[in-house]
Amino acid sequence: MSEKDKMITRRDALRNIAVVVGSVATTTMMGVGVADAGSMPKAAVQYQDTPKGKDHCSVCAQFIAPHSCKVVAGNISPNGWCVAFVPKSA
């Protein structure tokens, strides 16, 4: 195979971009993709009612006082913790 045969043509690149954009649009319309805020089951994020060291829900950027979260579904403890923990910025 020659060097010229290995090159991607502009037509091929545009076709590939169109396929990717179409796939993303179709996936979005089907409702597949990023979960809605507050819809992840506790088990999926390994939620626990106790803190992990100094990390706990009340100091997490995802926490919505008094007992909600942008990621985890249902009521949560301000002293809880999960793998979605993101410390609040100072």
UniProtKB/Swiss-Prot annotation:
Family: Belongs to the high-potential iron-sulfur protein (HiPIP) family.
Protein name from the UniProt record: Iron oxidase
Modification after translation: Predicted to be exported by the Tat system. The position of the signal peptide cleavage has been experimentally proven.
Signal peptide: 1-37
GO biological process terms, semicolon-separated: aerobic electron transport chain
Subcellular location: Periplasm
UniProt-listed SUPFAM superfamilies: HIPIP (high potential iron protein) (SSF57652)
Subunit record text: Homomultimer.
EC numbers for this chain: 1.16.3.-
UniProtKB keywords: 4Fe-4S, Electron transport, Iron, Iron-sulfur, Metal-binding, Oxidoreductase, Periplasm, Signal, Transport
Biological role stated in the UniProt entry: Catalyzes the oxidation of Fe(2+) to Fe(3+) coupled to cytochrome c552 reduction.
InterPro entries to which the protein is assigned, alphabetical: Feoxidase_Iro (IPR048112), High_potential_FeS_prot (IPR000170), HIPIP_sf (IPR036369), TAT_signal (IPR006311), TAT_signal_bac_arc (IPR019546)
GO cellular component: periplasmic space
Residues annotated for [4Fe-4S] cluster binding in this entry: 57, 60, 69, 82
An example Gene Ontology molecular-function term: metal ion binding
Disulfide bonds: none
